[in-house]
């Protein structure tokens, strides 16, 4: 990334123009052409820009951003907004959801900001028109002590509610989940939640983790509040009917079952299906096993672009790993991993072990360095062409990389809580929670005037930016869209496994915990794999077209 900033700076010096500080820095033919939604933290305006950084649309609110914002299929904007509180003061303060139509008119709002619960950071729009809302839930020092907490003070555990919007304001809560219903502790044997946390990985150790309060936008501060988990992301997988919830303070993310009633979610059925990032949080590891460091934005790749290894996008997660307290030093990475998803929707866990995988499928950069580091907020989004759009949130730096890590598009958020940033001035307050790019054929743009306006920044420099439109079908860059015709056998296999395919494919053989054992790209119709050196047992064969447009996972048995 440094080389592009230096190149841009040098070009401006050569042309006699003052240095560029915000807006578009780089756009190349290798970037995925689309429209990027940018909602600066604390600002009241949200922009949709093209790849040249020019405004396509904008929405104004009376309320400052409460972090997340999304463009829905009908062209409406769903955003979070800030509401003050006398109880909750943590970073990522929200409290209000707003939905504006394409023309900027407020269609609907919902407020969750009282003395017992307060929305923060994120929400997830569901295909049925419901919305999942993440919130802090207040628990008094007395309640914390009664649950076995040894420290004094209140706790704000996470809760999730599902709301059906009604009219122009409000809605009906039809489902809810509370972390408080899923606690375990080994300090007081007289309490009903007594047990060994390592024997109950689906529950939260009530004595794990410190609390925080206050802090700047998007990150926890220090103080005497009860921000215990500091969850900062929630996402929904409609096919699996599962929810992912992210905890910055615990350095792990969780997957919950949504195929439950509220009553069931309060019991064993509401325990965690899966957790990953920090096995020490559930007594199955130490600090040396930790792999996530104050991370943000874990989400499935189902509705985005191809996976890096051609695996099953329903079992592949992308996460921005911020890197605070990383042993090698503060540095961020964007990490991709394959979850040990089983056919029944559960996740494999060996007795006494931590949840897999033990290794990543892909990580950018390969070697973390301080020049790429955001201590809070941030996110990443896989593009249909296999690139990844990264939001290095603290400085409002957005950039797109190829699978090999080459930067092909760069932009610095040109708007802040103080308004448009003047070109040439140092941007202050332009931190950006996340950024999302939408393809030109996204349904939100059907029938819309997509003519570009001016750049977002004030006093923009003269520039000659060219767009590089992609083909209409952006799902696989013109590759055949029919599914793979695949046969393999024998199954069970002993020494040789044969694969036949009508398209070039990439295959990956994984153990049942999701660890990659071997992989290859094959272009011939017939292919043979030597499995004679593998121990007998069950394995997963992940097969995908060359660019990941179609994929499937198969169970393979190997006999001695």
Where are these regions (language model features)?
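Short, surface-exposed linear motifs at loops/turns and structural transition points
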Residues: 8, 474, 505
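Histidine-/acidic-rich catalytic cores in large beta-rich domains
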Residues: 20-474
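Sec-dependent N-terminal signal peptides
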Residues: 4-13
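C-terminal outer-membrane/trafficking sorting elements
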Residues: 50-51, 480-560
